[in-house]
Structures are given as C-alpha cells and as structure tokens.
Amino acid sequence: GLRIGVSAAKGLSYALNIPLISVPTLEALAHQIEIPKGAIVAMLDARRMEVYSAIYDANYNETRATEAEVLTPDSYQELLKSSIVYFVGNGVAKTKDLITHKNAQFIEDKLPSAKQMCALSYRKFKSNTFEDVAYFEPYYLKDFIAIPSKK
C-alpha cells in the first residue's frame, strides 16, 4: 500500500508540477501530545516484541532517528534515568508491560492524525522543504520481501 501511495503522489506531483512533501509517521505521532519537558518516544508495533521508534524532545526535535528495536525491560533505561519519557503510539501496549520505571508515562489510543500531518506539511511548504520527485522512496526499516500468492 505504501509503495502504491508514494507512486501515485509522485506521479501527481510530476504531472501537475507541484511540490512533493513527506511527513514521517513517527513525527506526526509525536505531535499528538504536548509535554512541558522530557522526551517523547513515538512507537509503532512491528510484531512480536519489536517496535519502530524515534525519540523527540519537548520541542519535537528528533534526538534519535527511527530504528527497529526489540523491546526488553532495559529498553530506554538511560533516557528514563534523566527525564520523564512519554511513550505514544500502538507500540505502547507491549511496552507498558516491560518498562516499569517511575519516569515512564504511557499514552495509549493515539494515532497519527490528518490534522497534524497537514500542519507539518504546511510548515515544510512554508520553508520550501520538498522531496526530489525523481529519487524519493518510502523509508523502510526492513527490506521488502514479496511473498508469492498461494494460488
């Protein structure tokens, strides 16, 4: 689905001679909450005990790039020692059972919203932050593996 959506957006961008803007899902997810201080860990469930996550400060500056990680009880312990950490996204369900640090705050039932994506897109538009239509590809943390149909 993502490859098809990106291909359609690139085609429209090229044909209509309009800019292409991308909004990372985890960034849009981080913007779903406002915090006075501390860190935001935006996370998406990646099956089993794995999540895709990125870390942002209270001003939404990315402090750790997106990565795939296997959750353990020791995950994020260094960060939790120094500040309150707000975990947001559908990866929270599995995280809250593992991480019991007093500085961990779990915010459930938040998904990236169209409102936040529009606001982030508008900010990129105003700052002329556009993708190169010829070279833009969706960002995958794992290699795509096509599975042949069983029919």
Question: Could you tell me what each predicted segment is?
Answer:
Residues 107-139:
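Glycine-rich phosphate-binding/hydrolytic loop that grips phosphoryl groups
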Residues 8-12, 29-30, 117, 121:
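Buried hydrophobic packing segments
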Residues 2, 29, 40, 66-67, ...:
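Glycine-rich, flexible loop/turn motifs
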Residues 1-20:
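DPxDG-like acidic metal-binding loop motif
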Residues 19-112, 140, 145-146, 150:
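Surface "functional belts" at beta-alpha junctions
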